[in-house]
Amino acid sequence: MTSQEIPKSPERLAILEKIAQYEREGRFDEDVENDPPSRVLLPEEIEYADRRFSAECRRTAAFGAAYLYFWNLRRKKEIILCKTEGLEHLAGVKGAVITCNHFHPMDSFIMQKVFDASKHPKRMYRVIREGNYTSFPGFYGFLMRNCNTLPLSSNMQTMKKFLRAVDWVLSEGNCLLIYPEQSMWWNYRKPKPLKPGAFDMALKNHVPVVPCFITMADSDLVGGDGFPVQEYTPHLGAPIWPDETLSRPAAREQLRQKTEDFCRETYETVYGIPLRYETRES
């Protein structure tokens, strides 16, 4: 169908208006979607990176369902995934923190397909927000709890378990996907400022950051929401190693800045325009 035949979704229009408002106000780390109310994740409710047989069975079922669901989205052209640029940068590392921009509920599965294509011998775990683990019902909740997820928590004791799991995941040569932008803005094309937590984890565990920035382009297709279906292209950068001759704060900031530089340079190269935000201060 053409865009004239499908009215644009009022919900999506409201989200875009909210994104524009938050950009003007510099509120880059705040979510714009109406997520379900969340609750605190307690330490006795989770065994991070659980390798018990029952957990492995749930993991296998969850990944099977997720792969089928994602395949169906691609078959129906609701998501169009293009060839990854720089795949060799991920194939050659052992443990690593992978960073990525966050713009779609399924972008972590875009990253799973990228990881699979790299032929990396280990697993990719993903850090998710607390409410995604505790409060999503049904099918999505099952995926959130069983697809190699490491949920954050507002409970201090749970966070201690989380950090121990991060150390184990990286020490075993696995990769850890983190969204340091912290917020998800639907199909937002610009890179957002990055929070420091991901870079602290890389520094503490002596592993590199492999930055990824996913660009998008309007296809000729129009989705059910009245907006053009996007063609997504993942761009992987060379591993960024911590400079351990620097103080920890300086080394962390260097990792963060180099990752931001990669995202900005990729944005400006692909879109052919300088990165500018419509903030009130600019």
Give residue ranges: language-model regions.
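Short, flexible loop segments at the rims of nucleotide/cofactor-binding pockets, characterized by
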Residues: 73-78, 152-157, 187-189
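Short, structurally constrained coil/turn elements
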Residues: 76-78, 92, 120, 172, ...
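Catalytic core of membrane glycerolipid acyltransferases/transacylases, capturing the structured
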Residues: 92-156
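Conserved beta-strand scaffold positions in the cores of enzyme catalytic domains, especially
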Residues: 84, 126, 149-151, 209-211, ...
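Short amphipathic alpha-helical segments and helix-helix/interface helices
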Residues: 70, 116, 141, 166, ...
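Membrane-anchoring hydrophobic helices of lipid-metabolizing enzymes
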Residues: 2-112, 145-146
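Non-catalytic C-terminal accessory region of glycerolipid acyltransferases
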Residues: 2-38, 160-282
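Structural motif corresponding to alpha-helix initiation and N-cap regions
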Residues: 84-87, 137, 160-163
